[in-house]
Amino acid sequence: MVKSMNTRKAQTALHTLGIMTCPAAGEVPVPEKFYFRKLTLIGKELGLAVFVFFPNRIDWQRRRVVGYAYSAESGRWEKRVFPFPDVVYDRCFYSNRNAYAAYREPIRRLMSTSGIHFLGYGLKGKWNVHQMLMRDERLRPFLPETEQLQEMNDIARWLDGKGELFLKPQGGSHGKGVLRIQKIPDGFGVTGRTARNEPVRGGFRSSSRMLDWVRQFTNGRPYLIQRYLHLNTASGDAFDIRALMQKNSKGLWELTGLAVRQGAPGSVTSNLHGGGHAEEAKPYLGRLYGDAAGGILESVKTLAQRVPEVLEQHHGRLVELGVDIGVDTDGSVWLLEANSKPGRSAFAALPGKQASLSAVRNPMLYAKYVLDTRKGVPARQSASL
């Protein structure tokens, strides 16, 4: 039985915040339960009633959604029917192209519905983000050479000219589906992770066999070819730096924290979901780069703080960004990616808890700011699904 949102309880909150997400498997189809529970409790402190809803469970005529609210009393997620929320926090992750296609139209419709304010509009894909960042002359020198994979011969061309490359899906996350391909004395070597985030490694004597294998591996999904950067320690462990940029209680961007993510031994990626771990950025860089670490850290911060301004200028309103930055073996800094729906696991693993606490609290503080002022954020420009 689905309960309706209790009117008397709802009136104790000044506003409602709906966390929009794609349903997970299980009896209670709420993903990111731990994170969403924290948001609910913080929302209660701030006078916000928080619930989770799904874009495929919307009653447009009655302006209602079916979703779940966390009950601190019972410690459970309770299924209810809610009025349309005042603000929407988008945490939808699409498992594949079919899921994206299924949710695209209802989300577009919700974006254009009067009385609903999206805290931010999700970025489309890695190629789209790369193109927007390339338009900024200050960021352009820090972006690795990148192009869309149109045909398998593109890979052969890159290998002929550069000897190695990095192949990554346009819509992927968690380091899934990535490959490093390189020329080796007796053919070609391939290292990476499958779409299920399992390690993969192989060798091919001929270009044709390697390309046939890559064709099956990519399986028709959109991919990017990128210059391979040697972002690893002296012992060969891959690492990068996650900078979390968020809007705060005043509607301004701030750098919430920096965390180094080091991949599992032998991994081509630094992602934690592939068995890596997180460390504090300053001491980690100090061990690797000595006296140069201070300058590298300042470059990382400068890049991270520039990215939100550029993306909002070309894309539209954003609420937070995970900016991934690499440092190669000679200390050069590279802007790798920007993600509008960042995770927080790297900061939760650090010894200091301030960044981890702020990472969770800031979206709610910004939501309260938006609801209290209804101004102070740029109007939506070209953001689209």
Residue spans for each PLM region:
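Active-site nucleotide/adenylate-binding loops and adjacent lid/helix of ATP-dependent enzymes
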Residues: 109, 113, 119-226
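Glycine-rich phosphate/pyrophosphate-binding beta-alpha loops
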Residues: 261-269, 339-352
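A long amphipathic alpha-helix within ATP-dependent nucleotide-binding catalytic cores
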Residues: 208-240, 244-326, 360-373, 379-381
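Redox-cofactor binding/interface segments in oxidoreductases and associated redox assembly factors
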Residues: 19, 89-90, 167, 226
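A short beta-strand motif that forms the metal-chelation/ATP-contact edge
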Residues: 325-327, 332-342
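Short acidic-glycine loop/turn motifs at beta-strand connectors
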Residues: 73, 182-187, 247-251, 328-330
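Conserved N-proximal alpha/beta basic substrate-recognition cap immediately N-terminal to
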Residues: 31-38, 45-146, 150-154
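Nucleotide-activated donor-dependent transferases that construct or modify glycoconjugates
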Residues: 13-27
